[in-house]
Amino acid sequence: MTLQDLLDRILGRQPASATTARERLQLVLAHDRSDLSPELLDQMRREIFEVVAKYVDIDLEEGDVTLETEDRVTALVANLPIRRSMASSKPGS
């Protein structure tokens, strides 16, 4: 996510349709290059959420795991908003 994307999200601005189309195409290409089925990607998302949730309280509705491609390199990117760490929610800490 670029700084401009972050500002647009915070300010509630909608991306242009060309930008949305380009991002969708990049997602399709990333899926093709990674050779991951949608089912496997969904399973990975669930497991990543489960593991991270053991350590911090995350917002599952806002969280997302995606494949992103930049300069012919595909990356698995997790965007998981953290509400608080589990250590801060334990009594006596």
Curated annotation (Swiss-Prot):
Give the top-rank taxon of the lineage listed in the UniProt record for this protein: Bacteria
Keyword entries, A-Z:
Cell cycle, Cell division
Coiled-coil annotation: which residues? none
Keyword Cell cycle assigned: yes
Q: Which Gene3D superfamilies match?
A: Cell division topological specificity factor MinE
Family from the record: Belongs to the MinE family.
State the protein's name. Cell division topological specificity factor
Q: Which organism is it from?
A: Synechococcus sp. (strain WH7803)
Gene coding for it: minE
